[in-house]
Amino acid sequence: MRLTAQEVYDKLVNEDGILQLEGQIKFYLGDVNIIVKQRDVVGNIMQEWLQGWLDKRGIEYAPSENTQMPPDFFLNPDDKTKNLLEVKAFNRNRGPGFDIADFRMYEEEIINKPYMLNVDYLIFGYDMNDDGVVTIKDVWLKKVWEITRRMEDWPINLQIKDNVVHKIRPGIWYAEDTARTDYTVFESLEDFISAIEETVFQNPKTHNNAGTWKATFLRSYKQETGIDLSIPRWSEIKDKYDLKSVRKLEKAKSDLAKATDQYEKIKERIQLYHRKLHAEQEKNNVGKVGKIQDDIEKQKRNAEKAKEKINKAQAKIDELE
């Protein structure tokens, strides 16, 4: 039978209950049998396991011959432009550390084969206990832009060695607490393509292609899909994916509100002291008059400090907005 990627996901999770299953990785050589307890091994095993699962369930597929690029499986062997499935796995107790693709190969591939952008990523988040028992904690089915993000100095999260761009790396798409994440994953295919285009420009190895890359891609994509994509400029969208800047802006606004509130309260205290001063001056109470005047001067200094905080917070807001 033939299934779509979504149907494969549904069968794994809902019919076979993969989230309730347990397993082990066993290895034997000669008369020695062991249970593998190295957690890093699981990620590589899962693709082979899924292939065995597809065979066991009688699901048609054709394996990919190109191990350097997605997908791993063509779920429609008669049309290798549709129902493309890539399998990834990572230790759920850590962040995803798998590679998505070599950047240079990928930016060329999506021009020559725009349908590669429709690859479904079947991602397993696994755990292994000290006895080598493997369980699957989460399963996701995602598009590439739903698992990728920007980084500090690049529009795409990349593996960079000796200033040379290598692999596209994933972001964290499952974070419930955004305070622990500096950059959010892309919201759309269009934003993802914008980041790819800017990376082509920024990367010395691909910079010479940057001037025509977008136009070439858009022509190819329309020819393949019939759709005219509208790709935003990276400079127009990059800040919305920078959660650090968002948090800095929120903090600056909070600091501004606190400093403004403090400043208003100080002004009220100064007015109160002036009323008290007037009353004591009428009574000719020299001792209290002197003390109140000292209090007024102290509050004026506090007001100046609060005003400095207001100006500093406002300047930070202007910088970030």
Descriptions of predicted regions:
Residues 1-69, 89-257, 263, 269, ...:
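Nucleic-acid endonuclease domains
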Residues 67-77:
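Beta-rich nucleic-acid/ligand-interaction surfaces
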Residues 73-75, 83-91:
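Conserved catalytic cores of phosphodiester-cleaving nucleases, focusing on short active-site segments
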Residues 77-79, 129-130:
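Short acidic-glycine loop/turn motifs at beta-strand connectors
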Residues 81-83, 120:
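Conserved active-site beta-strand-loop modules that form the wall/rim of enzyme catalytic pockets
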Residues 82, 293-296, 300, 307, ...:
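A generic structural signal for ordered secondary structure
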Residues 260-296, 302:
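Extended alpha-helical coiled-coil "stalk/arm" regions
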Residues 319-321:
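Short acidic DE-rich linear segments
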